[in-house]
């Protein structure tokens, strides 16, 4: 017996509308790359070369940019490193092309930041270290007067950088790390997402006072649960204050290998699925170029950016009528250059046609030794399994959607 009202049938769409609309933000320009608002989620990474080695740094930046990192960050721990950025930028222009660059500045870094701002498009600071408070052994609390004194020192120290970036039309990232909160934040809020958010807010409010809004925020942690809580809280807190700055997402120190990728996908992907996040960096203990495919894979899985063929394939079961794993690899090898297509490879007709209904093309086991080719939901032809992959290629060609793969040379 039916006990619930029948819901209205939704209009069929190629992809469902997101459950969580994307968080509205300002647009922040980093050279010619736009972050936030409705612009595509930006992928970025960081070189691991010493910035003082100009040739090595230029080579590292170029490798990352060619791999798909749209913005590249470099570490700038000293004034000498800051001055080296001038030569790095010039050599990039001479030997490659301009690349949007971010300088990473940490401990008591105002002089370094003011210098390097001349040569980069964005400066990243860590609020817990930028105006460094040396921990005092035995301290049990901060008085309100002490708290305000440090806040005034931060305003006095930080404001010149804000004014410089505003005058040069450059960007700032206020990048909080869970592991480096200032001592007074730890005393006041504990080692919590609240402390992370308040740490960023202190600096963001100074930017707002100076009418400088070319600001990106990040709240990174090595544990996805902590970073998820921090970003969600930050979205509520900053938006309530009208400081709708874009967010840079990342699980810091995610590690390496499969597990590092899983941690990054869980943290970054969950927030993106909730509509939170405007630029991402996957942090792996590997060559930086290996971070880039993971980042684009996360975006592809959420249908936020399409940079490869989307393959739909069942896990195989007793009903499968051909060697699914082998055939999928053959189909992938033949079609992986056709960026933008969705291709389904399904083992049988029980779930195949329904599960692949939104794919552009389908390859489905029909009977032993015979496969069916689909264009969308329409079965086009049945061919012997031995001819299946070539028949799929011919179908794509007949539809005018085939391009030859790029030359290996």
Swiss-Prot record:
Cofactor: binding comment: Binds 1 [4Fe-4S] cluster.
GO terms for biological process, alphabetical: isopentenyl diphosphate biosynthetic process, methylerythritol 4-phosphate pathway; terpenoid biosynthetic process
Molecular-function GO terms, alphabetical: 4 iron, 4 sulfur cluster binding; 4-hydroxy-3-methylbut-2-en-1-yl diphosphate synthase activity (ferredoxin); iron ion binding
Keywords: 4Fe-4S, Iron, Iron-sulfur, Isoprene biosynthesis, Metal-binding, Oxidoreductase
Pathway(s) of this molecule: Isoprenoid biosynthesis; isopentenyl diphosphate biosynthesis via DXP pathway; isopentenyl diphosphate from 1-deoxy-D-xylulose 5-phosphate: step 5/6
Residues reported in the UniProt entry to bind [4Fe-4S] cluster: 314, 317, 348, 355
Cofactors demanded by this protein: [4Fe-4S] cluster
Sequence ranges of Polar residues compositional bias: 1-12
Pfam assignment, any one: GcpE
EC numbers: 1.17.7.1
Region entry Disordered, spans: 1-22
Record InterPro entries: Dihydropteroate_synth-like_sf, IspG_bac, IspG_bac-typ, NO2/SO3_Rdtase_4Fe4S_sf
Tree of life domain: Bacteria
Entry function: Converts 2C-methyl-D-erythritol 2,4-cyclodiphosphate (ME-2,4cPP) into 1-hydroxy-2-methyl-2-(E)-butenyl 4-diphosphate.
PANTHER family referenced in this protein's UniProt entry, alphabetically: 4-HYDROXY-3-METHYLBUT-2-EN-1-YL DIPHOSPHATE SYNTHASE, 4-HYDROXY-3-METHYLBUT-2-EN-1-YL DIPHOSPHATE SYNTHASE (FERREDOXIN), CHLOROPLASTIC
Name of this chain's protein: 4-hydroxy-3-methylbut-2-en-1-yl diphosphate synthase (ferredoxin)
Organism: Synechococcus sp. (strain JA-2-3B'a(2-13)) (Cyanobacteria bacterium Yellowstone B-Prime)
GN (gene name): ispG
